[in-house]
Amino acid sequence: MFGFGHHGHHGQDQPPQHHGGGGGGAHQPTFKIFCRADEGYCVAVREGNVVLAPTNPRDEHQHWYKDMRFSAKIKDEEGNPAFALVNKATGLAIKHSLGQGHPVKLAPFNPEYPDESVLWTESGDVGKSFRCIRMLNNIRLNFDAFHGDKDHGGVHDGTTIVLWEWAKGDNQCWKILPWGDEAYAGGSANAPRGGNEPTVRIFCKADEGFSVTVRGGSVCLAPTNPRDEYQHWIKDMRHSNSIKDEEGYPAFALVNRVTGEAIKHSQGEGHPVKLVPYNPGYQDESVLWTESRDVGHGFRCIRMVNNIYLNFDALHGDKDHGGVRDGTTVALWKWCEGDNQRWKIVPW
């Protein structure tokens, strides 16, 4: 796996299995990059250029690594974590262009050197889970499928990827998603494990029609939608044998499928839980949780491994406060026997 920075533990001693050309990195997830203008085309390398091509999972030039190794310490001006996009077939990273209207470039990727010219960030959701991909150090210049909007005839085989200021075009709205069976089911290069890791849904008894999701960098509840990848979580049990809570229940992390971030303890009672980049190789109790005994109908409390008195709480999601709604914050609270504190973590 890539080494991932986390709380000063930067994992630089864990170079990627793939470096340079060739089809290495078999255990790393690879991603497809596509835009809303035509989801049947993916970003590819062709003759040294970055273009769109008809989606083909067997074309390794359409497979990209999303390298998050610098994400903990390098952010854009909005606080979004930096990543590099490294082509599986060539080992080259997508590099900033000369400016607006110019095609993005390709450059050799040095995993030991934080070169800002190959670092990108994703914006907030700009509709249906699409996001802008923009320069780390100039978030006003975004990936743009050149003339890929309807007014210019749409995307075609060979459409160039350039940078352009935000014009609200479908050709500027992107998703970076894992390839299918050949990729880890998770959505980030700092995912907990290789292989097809099953994802889980997290919901509370107050309203089982809502599931825990990531939105705008926060953990909240949203109407349940299996197609919304942000509602998919990996329950990583890798430390469960060695770390238990005071009642003996095993510890786990909850890692978002899309962002690769783990839910982190809040600052205290009443504060929202947080998200941080997940480093599977580093034992960090601040991202570890346990489940209580059954508190009725198979529901359980989800609580801090090192303070089981603070539980997941759908803030003001009890009947007295109007119930769960779209956007209800997940905070920590002492046990009050509320339905908004009783949770299930079940497979999708």
Swiss-Prot record:
Q: Which InterPro entries match?
A: Ricin_B-like_lectin_EULS3-like, Ricin_B-like_lectins
Q: Which Gene3D superfamilies match?
A: 2.80.10.50
* GO molecular-function terms, A-Z: carbohydrate binding
Q: Where are the annotated segments for Disordered?
A: 1-26
Superkingdom to which the source organism belongs: Eukaryota
Domain remarks = The ricin B-type lectin domain binds glycan structures.
Write out the tissue specificity statement of the associated record. Expressed in roots and shoots.
* Membrane-crossing segments per the record: none
Would you tell me the protein name for this molecule? Ricin B-like lectin R40C1
Q: Which gene encodes it?
A: R40C1
Limits of the Ricin B-type lectin domain: 199-345
Q: Which UniProt keywords apply?
A: Lectin
- What does induction of this protein depend on? Induced by abscisic acid (ABA) and salt stress in roots.
Keyword Cell membrane: yes or no? no
Q: What exactly does this protein do?
A: Lectin which binds carbohydrates in vitro. Interacts through its lectin domain with glycan structures containing specific motifs.
